[in-house]
């Protein structure tokens, strides 16, 4: 059997999701697998009702949804439903793996990766985990015992995983962000701005929005209007109507506001300064592009991992960190002061760029290829 015939038969399952921070890296890995093995088959396994069930098919891949849910830590008595969902998910994961017969299963974190990778382990199918954050999630920590390799984006992850399994690859970046190079004038036009000397601030709260960041901007729109700074504001779907009404009350404000920005390559290119949550994949994009950044970590995430992500940058003078509890008071004034300080913007850009790990998806596929080849030789 020649190499092309062997590659044509390769099948991969990619499992996980829940937020853009899991889904976008998963899709980037899938795209890199297709570039390496054009004839391979890829199946996603996600969680019913979560974002991946829409985003993955839109990217051209099939997906199976498991009825998995997370634990309700506030109402522990209701978790019997979670236990039932886990049992059903294990059965469906077993059926999916047996029918699809993958050569390898890749876990990207999130509820669905648990049943899928556990079943793969029990069937002797090799697995690889991609951990996006500087503080490993519970699911990935549990699954790491059976994984062949664990691809990480931060140093010092041996406090969570076996050192011999760790590969420092960085986080996969969406191809349009990593490889797209739009012009600034084109980017400004997309948001309805004319080419001018006015600085631009991009405010994003992750794929689901961020209430504190939104309120911090909405409550101080008068200052934004007076400053002459142009504002690109992604609110998430839950805040968009409130934000639009607030913007209408400030006719002098130069602001593009939407619930979701379809062209983040344009948004990053146009921005002189970015205000963002501290999700791992957002940080990886900002590092790669060298964007001066204010990070406002979400307090509503497991084990406060966004604060740990943000500290990994702020302690290196690579970003400004504002705690969520202080954002309403400090965020607008800090952003408006910083965006008018070219020396500080330049310093932040230099420092954040040193943390970039380009072509992470291809590095991860390198590890996948080594494991697949090793399994072929062993069998």
Curated annotation (Swiss-Prot):
Pfam families: Glyco_tran_28_C, Glyco_transf_28. One of its GO terms (cellular component) is plasma membrane. The keyword Cytoplasm does not apply. GO terms for molecular function: UDP-N-acetyl-D-glucosamine:N-acetylmuramoyl-L-alanyl-D-glutamyl-meso-2,6-diaminopimelyl-D-alanyl-D-alanine-diphosphoundecaprenol 4-beta-N-acetylglucosaminlytransferase activity; undecaprenyldiphospho-muramoylpentapeptide beta-N-acetylglucosaminyltransferase activity. InterPro entries: GlcNAc_MurG (IPR006009), Glyco_trans_28_C (IPR007235), GlycoTrans_28_N (IPR004276). Keywords: Cell cycle, Cell division, Cell inner membrane, Cell membrane, Cell shape, Cell wall biogenesis/degradation, Glycosyltransferase, Membrane, Peptidoglycan synthesis, Transferase. GO terms for biological process: carbohydrate metabolic process; cell division; cell wall organization; lipid glycosylation; peptidoglycan biosynthetic process; regulation of cell shape. Its main location: membrane. Pathway: Cell wall biogenesis; peptidoglycan biosynthesis. The keyword Glycosyltransferase applies. Its EC number is 2.4.1.227. CDD domains: GT28_MurG (cd03785). Cell wall formation. Catalyzes the transfer of a GlcNAc subunit on undecaprenyl-pyrophosphoryl-MurNAc-pentapeptide (lipid intermediate I) to form undecaprenyl-pyrophosphoryl-MurNAc-(pentapeptide)GlcNAc (lipid intermediate II). NCBIfam families: murG. Belongs to the glycosyltransferase 28 family. MurG subfamily. This is UDP-N-acetylglucosamine--N-acetylmuramyl-(pentapeptide) pyrophosphoryl-undecaprenol N-acetylglucosamine transferase. It comes from Porphyromonas gingivalis (strain ATCC BAA-308 / W83).
């Amino acid at each position: 059997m020649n190499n092309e015939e062997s590659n044509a038969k390769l099948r991969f399952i990619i499992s996980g999701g829940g937020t853009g921070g899991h889904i976008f890296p998963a899709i980037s890995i899938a795209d890199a697998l297709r570039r390496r093995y054009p004839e391979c088959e890829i199946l996603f396994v996600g969680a019913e009702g979560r974002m991946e069930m829409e985003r993955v098919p839109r990217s051209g891949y099939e997906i199976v949804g498991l009825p998995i849910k997370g634990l309700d830590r506030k109402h522990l008595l209701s978790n019997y439903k979670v236990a039932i969902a886990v049992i059903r998910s294990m059965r469906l994961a077993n059926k999916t793996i047996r029918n699809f017969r993958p050569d390898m299963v890749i876990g990207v974190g999130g509820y669905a990766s648990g049943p899928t990778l556990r079943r793969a382990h029990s069937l002797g199918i090799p697995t690889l985990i991609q951990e996006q954050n500087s503080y490993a999630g519970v699911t990935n920590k549990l699954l790491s015992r059976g994984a062949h390799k664990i691809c990480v984006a931060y140093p010092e992850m041996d406090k969570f995983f076996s050192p011999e399994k760790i590969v420092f690859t960085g986080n996969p970046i969406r191809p349009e962000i990593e490889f797209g190079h739009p012009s600034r004038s084109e980017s400004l036009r997309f948001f309805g701005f004319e080419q001018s000397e006015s600085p631009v601030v991009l405010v994003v709260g992750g794929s689901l929005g961020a209430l504190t960041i939104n309120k911090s901007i909405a409550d101080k729109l008068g200052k934004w209007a007076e400053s002459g700074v142009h504002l690109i504001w992604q609110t998430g779907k839950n805040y968009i109507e409130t934000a639009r009404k607030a913007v209408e009350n400030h006719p002098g404000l130069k602001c593009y506001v939407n619930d979701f920005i379809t062209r983040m390559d344009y948004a990053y290119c146009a921005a002189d300064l970015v205000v963002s949550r501290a999700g791992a994949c957002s940080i990886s994009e900002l590092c790669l592009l060298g964007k001066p950044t204010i990070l406002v970590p979400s307090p509503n995430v497991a084990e406060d991992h966004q604060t740990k992500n943000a500290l990994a940058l702020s302690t290196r003078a690579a970003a400004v960190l504002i705690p969520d509890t202080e954002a309403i008071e400090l965020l607008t004034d800090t952003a408006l002061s910083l965006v008018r300080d070219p020396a500080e913007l330049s310093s932040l850009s230099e420092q954040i760029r040193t943390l970039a790990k380009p072509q992470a998806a291809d590095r991860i596929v390198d590890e996948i290829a080594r494991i697949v080849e090793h399994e072929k030789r062993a069998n």
